[in-house]
Amino acid sequence: MKTIYISGPITDLTTGQPREGWQQDFLDAEAKLRRMGFSVINPVDIAREVEDEYLCNWEYLQLTKEPKQPSRADYIMACLNRMKVCDRYGRLDGVYVIGEHIAALMSHGVQMEILMADVLGLPIYAECRDGLRVDRGLIPIEGHGKIEELLKD
């Protein structure tokens, strides 16, 4: 099965806090990709797994009587680790690649995910909502494959 990791803006770069509505954006993208026949690795699910792991850390709970809170690095590392099982990388609208350079206005997490996709040799695809119908799905970034390659097994 075709497995795609979806990436997109989570952090509001002006506040440093999670962007309002980020989870719904990822869930909508996942639903669309599943309809296209993909197995999807979604950061929303990874975040829940990380939080569950920390809530179930009984040693820490016994010592402190409070659950340990995951750090930003914990979330990012978990996402990067899960990318290793994917054969495609899809970026949501709002993540920009300019030529071979990652745009400076992206969060550290997205920058690292794009670099990891490159290291793993994953084709990088971009979702585009501006000027295209939503059901058009994913389009490739210039130089990173063709839509036919994305859709074939």
Predicted segments with their positions:
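Conserved catalytic or regulatory cores that recognize and/or transform ribose-phosphate-containing ligands
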Residues: M1-D153
